[in-house]
């Protein structure tokens, strides 16, 4: 908790000094073909008007797909579908995600303006190989020694954007993975930019909350 507090404060200091321009937040998430559970689809009204719980049925080990994406206050990357059976080790993460997707999108989106890359502390992200590659190709990034570990409450994708996408793409079960991918892609493109901006702009406030809570997590 002390390390998380220290790193949150350090990032706040860097932001106040203008050292982290145009933050780009990234993350991976697994989606499956089952219907997501939320307050709307997990409850029914009985004849007497009382609300009762209805459990959405789920199969064991449903078909799923891993996706990667990045967001910034002014835009979003392509939604990248990781091929079935592919493990995103350091080599594949660099070649299939950072080199093939992140850099081309960021160069086009920012058009020469400075930007800062964020990723979590997953093994393929924090490896020496990946950190060296990022250092050589992306001028500004939060290294594994700067980002607070185990902090999904600080990543806009984790605390907001993925939930938005799931709530809109997975309200009903998908018959196939192809159908799921189609819905995810459609809803990803339709998320209003103002919602992505709000999530990204919430990052600083959450850092301040971590500091106020002496490293505690933010709801």
Predicted regions and their residues:
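Conserved, non-catalytic sequence blocks in retroelement Pol enzymes and Pol-derived host proteins
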Residues: 14-18, 56-61, 85-92, 121-124, ...
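Surface-exposed helix-capping loop/turn segments at secondary-structure junctions
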Residues: 106-115, 141, 193-198
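Extended, low-complexity cationic-aromatic segments
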Residues: 2-103, 213-214
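Metal-dependent phosphoesterases centered on the DNase I-like endonuclease/exonuclease/phosphatase
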Residues: 129-145
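C-terminal anion-handling pockets and recognition modules
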Residues: 18-26, 30, 157-219
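Generic preference for well-ordered alpha-helical elements
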Residues: 5, 62-64, 90-95, 99, ...
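Mobile genetic element proteins and their domesticated derivatives, centered on retroelements
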Residues: 8, 27, 69, 97-98, ...
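Acidic/histidine-rich, metal-coordinating catalytic segments
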Residues: 26-28, 111-125, 147, 152-156
């Amino acid at each position: 908790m002390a390390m998380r507090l220290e790193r949150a404060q350090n990032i706040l200091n860097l932001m106040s000094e203008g050292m982290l321009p145009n933050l780009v937040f990234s993350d991976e998430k697994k989606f499956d073909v089952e219907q997501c559970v939320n307050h709307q689809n997990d409850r029914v009204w009985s004849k007497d008007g009382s609300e009762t719980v209805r459990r959405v049925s789920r199969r064991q080990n449903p078909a799923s797909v891993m996706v990667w994406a990045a967001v910034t206050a002014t835009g979003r990357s392509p939604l990248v579908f990781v091929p079935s059976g592919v493990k995103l080790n350091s080599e594949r993460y660099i070649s299939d995600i950072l080199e093939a997707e992140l850099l081309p999108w960021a160069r086009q989106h920012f058009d020469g303006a400075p930007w800062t890359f964020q990723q979590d502390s997953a093994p393929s992200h924090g490896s020496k190989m990946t950190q060296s590659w990022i250092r050589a190709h992306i001028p500004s990034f939060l290294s594994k020694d700067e980002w607070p570990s185990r902090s999904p409450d600080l990543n806009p994708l984790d605390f907001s954007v993925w939930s938005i996408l799931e709530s809109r793409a997975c309200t009903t079960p998908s018959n196939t993975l192809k159908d799921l991918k189609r819905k995810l892609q459609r809803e990803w493109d339709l998320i209003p930019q103002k919602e992505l901006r709000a999530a990204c702009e919430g990052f600083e406030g959450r850092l301040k909350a971590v500091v106020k809570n002496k490293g505690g997590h933010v709801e």
